[in-house]
From Swiss-Prot:
Organism lineage: Eukaryota, Metazoa, Chordata, Craniata, Vertebrata
Pfam family, one: RNA_pol_Rpb2_2
Record gene name: POLR2B
Protein's name in the database: DNA-directed RNA polymerase II subunit RPB2
UniProt-annotated binding residues for Mg(2+): D792
Catalytic reactions of this protein: RNA(n) + a ribonucleoside 5'-triphosphate = RNA(n+1) + diphosphate; a 3'-end ribonucleotidyl-ribonucleotide-RNA + H2O = a 3'-end ribonucleotide-RNA + a ribonucleoside 5'-phosphate + H(+)
Residues that, per the record, bind RNA: Q731, R841, R890, K942
Location relative to the cell: Nucleus
InterPro entries for the chain: DNA-dir_RNA_pol_su2, DNA-dir_RNAP_su2_dom, DNA-dir_RNAP_su2_hyb_sf, RNA_pol_bsu_CS, RNA_pol_bsu_protrusion, RNA_pol_Rpb2_2, RNA_pol_Rpb2_2_sf, RNA_pol_Rpb2_3
Residues the record lists as binding DNA promoter: K409
Main location: nucleus
Entry-annotated residues carrying N6-methyllysine: K1052
Length: 1174
């Protein structure tokens, strides 16, 4: 790798990295990783794979469209009509483009798409070859170059995005934030993320024990062809439980049966083998039990052999299977043909769907039975459903490929239908008109916009929530949303197993960041250095194995399997090998040199089971580890020195991987390596814990995800506290992105004076938390001063708040567009006038300009009009001509939210996709911290503001420092957030020392003792306690108080957004009860439990007032004779009950309107509730 003279400069021992050096060196390695990969690389790579490979593959895989008209029998002799063949070939994708209404294309910039509610998508073109074959003439080929077939939404910052590869300066000129990571789509102006979906790995054999079922054990294999549109077909091989439901319990032991796709009943396993053409018992057993010297296993198979004794020929077996699958009443030949089809095409398609795959399928089926028997005999552990090696994650690539495949199929179907019409009339057809470009464009747009993943027509089968609106509250919440994983298990299931933190998640998934409540443990987040494979072709590996003396299944004698090692590639058994040790070494060497084998391929050698499994598929989660050989890191000082200079010498992370110093290890392979936690473990010790290390962690703090990496000293907190902070960190206010002033987000909170924390973790620099922080370093005292901070509330310094402490601004955008609803109904922006407009509200319309929009800088308050819009009323035919109507228009303006006030910040008028006038208005309001607002430290210690005291009323130290925030001492003991206290100490040291404190987890260099000693060097109390003086009296407070700087966050939950009360107001139409919810000025529900309390109190009048007078009072007239509601005309005072012919005996009854409604609904179902008045 290096020249000889270069090697000479570095003495071998001198080049080793010592543990002390590693403290800094590991962060250089990690920085190089993030410089190259960023935080959303897994999204971008997956999308690029889709665009560059999958789309072309899907188009090529589609069979050519073959069309021919029906033969015409008009002229006597039958002439063969011409055949038309359409083949789709090379595809082209252009850069994202927008066609204005006048038809001029222009490149579309992402920010323009956001502001104008466009979709950021690129046009897709394809070459089509059209061949016309007429009898007696030579065929005529026409090439249709670059035919437009639809638009594909483009992921921001991917290869085909216009922002790809631009410098920070260029990005700023395009109004884009250089820190924005990309990895999302823009659909109709809103940003959408594709959440990675978890699924079980396909083509792998699992064996599970069945509880409470007729089977004791089941082996399953979800078989699926690589890159194919066919759905997965699962095959189950099960062993019946002892003493099953069968009648003859004693006669036959535990039989083994298979459940085949499209076959209704289960089929005895031996019959399946005979149907595959393996007839003699010995042949079959050779494929199941490789070693005949194993009496236990032979016994297990005996019952199955006895059961299938009646069927000895292949055709009889096929007939047996066919009669259980085909429609009843078809001939024997048809049944046999059907069974052959099922066995060839539907059973284990990943082994092969062509002819002559019987041997391979028999071997694979035999392997499944073998695994089942091993599990039944207790020689091999059962598989674990929650093991992360058995899981795959579907990212943007596979998800979009699944969608595009369906859309493309529909497109071809439409082309065929369109062309057939013309051909049947004997005409030629126009290809451009035959292609409905809307199918692909709208199909992809629909799924990305709604999150229903699948065909729009079958919306109920589709998965929901795959695509979500990108969370833009804080920068951390955006990053975290782009790295989220979702398990599609029903949220209502109370299953604990899939929600638990599994051992295999170490380093792949963050242990702290998961939501609380019903989705806990089902929604996860990627750890910082985890990466998801995009998949590569297995063909080079298969060719390599052929060369390296792997014996193919077709060519071996079954006896050879017993002592050889089986080789699986992507779950498919491809052959056996006699020297696995050497083979694995060669494969590893190739992967480390990145020769033939891509670095993300994983190879597992299971020594005990004699198997080598190689995986190249997409969606495996993996992470980089340092390679150790002979107890020494392969990473040397020279690599570190080159990385330090990486701005100048272009030496990057990729070079580390290429030089075989670092490699990617996935969850399955991680179980076969020996991992050292730190290079310190590799040092020669008296008693070595292990002398066979193969890999070493880069840094243990990389097991955390985005939100947990912001927590200082998370290893000193009780674990649920870290989980709480991970959720709250997403609600903190800060600067969510640097171009917020040119964006029109529906909601946005921006803190006035955010500060970077005094106490940071090393991981923060990769999350850009220093550039875009979300909080303020506040002086925090822990005391119960005046007692206004009980129950998690905090006392705040009023003077600090007046100086701008935690002040924030809140932006809300309103949007509206003109449109034509019909030929006589059109909407226009204008200032409505009371003379011509119907339905104008009692609101102030004077603030509008003549164009119907409000001007920037105007102060607006609840229910003011911000966008004036009218819609023309349709003319009524029955009106006489000449009579001019009073109203010609109806008002449909947009009003400010009732509970908000603010200043109009920005008004934007433009044209949208359809060319209609379209406007967005942004209103800003200043939010000053007040009593009831929510704050939190970075340790899950949340609290609301209980009271604000002026600075002169706050306690002060002898140096004259007053705290900004006072929290209650009771918040600490039971919650055990020691990290909070250490952060405060470290912050005190940092403020004195003038440098940033390091609070990275699992860091032995920093501990409480060291921080305390530093603090006492500066003349403070060892543990941060100080003497405080009472602000009211000036006397010394008897106890010492813990005080120091702590980083606090302001959360988005503010009193102004929650305060709500109502006296009278709008009611629902159906039951005349008050509306629900603050936005509709609704009432407060007096529920069942409140009602029960009042009944227990015996407060009857109060109860009546709440549930009747204050809700929906109503009066009805009731006939005294039959008790049914009577007809009453209150104007003429005439009352009658038609049924009883009674006009006199009628009473007035008061009852809730909802009760009257119920009675009438019952009457409609011919149940008569009679109200007998007494």
């Amino acid at each position: 790798m290096y020249d000889a003279d270069e090697d000479m400069q570095y003495d071998e021992d001198d080049d080793e990295i010592t543990p002390d050096l590693w403290q800094e060196a590991c962060w250089i390695v990690i920085s190089s990783y993030f410089d190259e990969k960023g935080l959303v690389r897994q999204q971008l790579d997956s999308f690029d794979e889709f665009i560059q490979m999958s789309v072309q593959r899907i188009v090529e895989d589609a069979p050519p469209i073959d069309l021919q008209a029906e033969a015409q029998h008009a002229s006597g002799e039958v002439e063969e009509p011409p055949r038309y063949l359409l083949k789709f070939e090379q595809i082209y994708l252009s850069k994202p483009t927008h066609w204005e209404r006048d038809g001029a294309p222009s490149p579309m910039m992402p920010n323009e798409a956001r502001l104008r509610n466009l979709t950021y998508s690129a046009p897709l073109y394809v070459d089509i070859t059209k061949t016309v074959i007429k009898e007696g003439e030579e065929q005529l080929q026409t090439q249709h170059q670059k035919t437009f077939i639809g638009k594909i939404p483009i992921m921001l910052r991917s290869t085909y995005c216009l922002l790809n590869g631009l410098t920070d300066r260029d990005l700023c000129e395009l109004n884009e934030c250089p820190l924005d990571p990309g990895g999302y789509f823009i659909i109709n102006g809103s940003e959408k993320v594709l959440i990675a979906q978890e699924k079980m790995a396909t083509n792998t054999v699992y064996v599970f024990a069945k509880k409470d079922s007729k089977y004791a054990y089941t082996g399953e294999c979800r078989s699926c062809l690589e890159n194919s549109s066919r759905p997965t077909s699962t095959i189950w091989v099960s062993m019946l439980a002892r003493g099953g439901q069968g009648a003859k319990k004693s006669a036959i032991g535990q039989r083994i049966v298979a459940t085949l796709p499209y076959i209704k009943q289960e089929v005895p396993i031996i019959i399946v083998f005979r149907a595959l053409g393996f007839v003699s018992d010995r042949d079959i057993l050779e494929h199941i039990i490789y070693d005949f010297e194993d009496p236990e296993m032979m016994e297990m198979v005996k019952p199955s052999l006895d059961e299938a004794f009646v069927i000895q020929e292949q055709n009889v077996a096929l007939n047996f299977i066919g009669s259980r699958g085909a429609k009843p009443g078809v001939t024997k030949e048809k049944r046999i043909k059907y069974a052959k089809e099922v066995l060839q095409k539907e059973m284990l398609p990943h082994v092969g769907v062509s002819d002559f795959c019987e041997t391979k399928k028999a071997y694979f089926l035999g392997y499944m039975v073998h695994r089942l028997l091993l599990a039944a005999l207790g020689r091999r552990e059962l598989d674990d459903r929650d093991h992360y090696g058995n899981k795959r994650l579907d990212l943007a690539g596979p998800l979009l490929a699944f969608l595009f495949r369906g859309m493309f199929k529909n497109l071809l179907k439409e082309v065929r239908i369109y062309a057939q019409k013309f051909i049947d009339r004997g005409k030629d057809f126009n290809l451009e008109l035959a292609i409905k470009t809307r199918i692909i464009s709208d199909g992809l747009k629909y799924s990305l916009a709604t999150g229903n993943w699948g065909d729009q027509k079958k919306a109920h089968q589709a998965r929901a929530g795959v695509s979500q609106v990108l969370n833009r509250l804080t920068f951390a919440s955006t990053l975290s949303h782009l790295r989220r994983l979702n398990s599609p298990i029903g949220r209502d299931g109370k299953l604990a197993k899939p929600r638990q933190l599994h051992n295999t998640l170490w380093g792949m998934v963050c242990p702290a960041e998961t939501p609380e409540g019903h989705a806990v443990g089902l929604v996860k987040n990627l750890a910082l250095m985890a990466y998801i494979s995009v998949g590569s072709q297995p063909s080079p590996i298969l060719e390599f194995l052929e060369e390296w003396s792997m014996e193919n299944l077709e060519e071996i004698s079954p006896a050879a399997i017993a002592d050889a090692t089986k080789i699986f590639v992507n779950g498919c058994w491809v052959g056996i090998h006699k020297d696995p040790e050497q083979l694995m070494n060669t494969l590893r060497k190739l992967r480390r040199q990145m020769d033939i084998i891509v670095s993300e391929v994983s190879m597992i050698r299971d020594i005990r089971e004699r198997e080598i499994r190689i995986y190249t598929d997409a969606g495996r989660i993996c992470r980089p580890l340092l390679i150790v050989e002979k107890q020494k890191l392969l990473l040397k000082k020279r690599h570190i020195d080159q990385l330090k200079e990486r701005e100048y010498n272009n030496y990057s992370w990729q070079d580390l991987v290429a030089s075989g110093v670092v490699e990617y290890i996935d969850t399955l392979e991680e179980e076969t390596v020996m991992l050292a936690m730190t290079p310190d473990d590799l040092q020669e010790k008296e008693v070595a814990y292990c002398s066979t290390y193969t890999h070493c962690e880069i840094h243990p703090s990389m097991i955390l995800g985005v939100c947990a990496s912001i927590i200082p000293f998370p290893d000193h907190n009780q674990s649920p506290r870290n989980t709480y902070q991970s959720a709250m960190g997403k609600q903190a206010m800060g600067v969510y992105i640097t171009n917020f002033h040119v964006r029109m987000d529906t909601l946005a909170h921006v803190l006035y004076y955010p500060q970077k924390p005094l106490v940071t973790t090393r991981s923060m620099e990769y999350l850009r938390f220093r550039e875009l922080p979300a909080g303020i370093n506040s002086i925090v005292a822990i005391a119960s001063y005046t007692g206004y901070n009980q129950e998690d509330s905090v006392i705040m310094n009023r003077s600090a708040v007046d100086r701008g402490f935690f002040r924030s601004v809140f932006y809300r955008s309103y949007k509206e567009q003109e449109s034509k609803k019909g030929f006589d109904q059109e909407e226009v922006f204008e200032k409505p006038t009371r003379e011509t407009c119907q339905g104008m509200r009692h609101a102030i319309y004077d603030k509008l300009d003549d164009d119907g929009l409000i001007a920037p800088g105007v102060r607006v308050s609840g229910d003011d009009v911000i966008i004036g819009k009218t819609v023309t009323l349709p003319e009524n035919e029955d009106e006489l001509e000449g009579t001019n109507r009073r109203y010609t228009k109806r008002d449909c303006s947009t009003f400010l939210r009732t509970s908000e006030t603010g200043i109009v910040d920005q008004v934007m008028v433009t044209l949208n996709q359809e060319g209609y006038k379209f406007c967005k208005i942004r209103v800003r309001s200043v939010r000053i911290p007040q009593i009831g607002d929510k704050f939190a430290s970075r340790h899950g210690q949340k609290g609301t503001c209980g009271i604000q005291y002026r600075q002169e009323d706050m306690p002060f130290t002898c140096e004259g420092i007053t705290p900004d925030i006072i929290i209650n001492p009771h918040a600490i003991p039971s919650r055990m957030t020691i990290g909070h206290l250490i952060e405060c100490l470290q912050g005190k040291v940092s403020a004195n020392k003038g440098e940033i404190g390091d609070a990275t987890p699992f860091n032995d260099a920093v501990n409480v003792q060291k921080i305390s000693n530093l603090l006492s060097d500066y003349g403070y109390h060892l543990r941060g306690n100080e003497v405080l003086y009472n602000g009211f009296t000036g006397r010394k407070i008897t106890s010492q108080i813990f005080i120091g700087p702590t980083y606090y966050q302001r959360l988005k939950h503010m009193v102004d957004d929650k305060i709500h009360s109502r006296a009278r107001g709008p009611i629902q139409i159906l039951n005349r009860q008050p509306m629900e919810g603050r936005s509709r000025d609704g009432g407060l529900r007096f529920g069942e439990m409140e009602r029960d309390c009042q009944i227990a109190h015996g407060a009857a009048q109060f109860l009546r007032e709440r549930l009747f007078e204050a809700s929906d009072p109503y009066q009805v007239h009731v006939c005294n004779l039959c008790g049914i509601m009577a007809i009453a005309n209150t104007r003429t005072h005439t009352y009658e009950c038609r049924g009883c012919r009674n006009k006199t005996q009628i009473s007035l009854v008061r009852m809730p309107y909802a009760c009257k409604l119920l009675f009438q609904e019952l009457m409609s179902m011919s149940i008569a509730p009679r109200m007998m008045s007494v």
